[in-house]
C-alpha cells in the first residue's frame, strides 16, 4: 500500500514525494542540464574578453536565472482563465544554445550589456507571441508539433556526440578514453532504463553519470583545482554589466525569441504527451510562453543570458514519467544554491 501511494505521488503533478525519492530524481535533472546551462556563459565571457571575476558572475547569473525561470514555470504566480504567467507544467528552463552564435557576434562587436538589452526586447516579443498563442496554435496541429518534437530530439545528437568526444575545444577531444567513458556511461543508462526497476530505472541517467564519473576518476580525467580555488559563497550582482540597446542586436535576438517561442510549443507538447498522455491546453501554452518572455525581461537585470525550455529534461520527463513539480522544483533549488 505504501509503495502504491509513493508511486502515485511521484507520478502526480501536484504530489509531495518523500525527500529520499525526490532528491535523486531532482539531481538527475540538474546533471543532465548544468553543463549546457553554464557553457553559453563561458563562451560569451571568452568572446567578450571578461575578467575571471566577471566570468564567474556571468556563470553565477546563468544558474540563478535558470533556477528562478524554472520555478516561475512550475508555480505560476498569475493564473486566470484568460491570462497566466507560467505554464504549471514539469519543465526545466536553462540558458539556451540557440542564442550562442548571435550572442558571440554581439559580444565581439559590442559587450554583454548589449546582449542583456536585446534580451529585454526579445522577452517582449515572446510575451506578444504568448498573448496570441490561442490564435497561432491552430497553425500547429499534432502533425506539426510531433515533427518539431522529433526534430528537437535529432538536433541534440551533434551536441551529444561533441560531449562524448570530450567537448569542443578540449585538448583530448576524440581520445579513446573519452569515448570509453562515454560508451560505458551510455551502457549503464540504457541497461537500467530497460531492465531496471523502481528507483534504479527512474534515476538511470543520474546513476549512469555517477558511474561514468567514477570511471573518469580512474583515468585521471577529473580536475579538482577549480573547486579548490572557488569561493564558497557569493551573492549575485544585479546590473553588474549594465543594460544597453543596439537596434541590430535587438532585431537579431528578438527574431530568435520569436522562433524559440514557437519551439516551446513543441517542448510543452512533448512534456505533456510523453509524461501526461495529453496535449497542453491553450492556457498552459499561453502561460508558458508569456512566463518565458517575462522571466527573460526581469532576469536580464540580474545579468542572466536568454533562457529556453531544455529538451534534454523534457526527454527525462517523457522517459521516466515523473512529472511531480516538487521534483523539478528541487532541481531548481539545487541550481539556485549552486549559483
Across the structure, where does each feature detected by a protein language model lie?
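Membrane-helix interface "capping/anchor" motifs
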Residues: 74-89, 134-139, 193-203, 320-325
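Structural signature of hydrophobic alpha-helical transmembrane segments
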Residues: 52-68, 109-123, 169-184, 250-257, ...
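Generic transmembrane alpha-helix signature in multi-pass membrane proteins
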Residues: 41-47, 99-108, 134, 158, ...
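Membrane-embedded helical hairpins/re-entrant loop segments and their flanking transmembrane helices
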Residues: 19, 45-86, 255-325
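N-terminal signal-anchor module of multipass membrane proteins
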Residues: 1-91, 98-106
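Flexible hinge motifs at transmembrane-helix junctions and intramembrane kinks/re-entrant loops
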Residues: 52-59, 187-235, 240-262, 266
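Membrane-embedded alpha-helical modules
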Residues: 106-223, 329-339
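Intrinsically disordered, low-complexity non-transmembrane regions of multi-pass membrane transporters
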Residues: 1-25, 224-239, 273, 277-280, ...
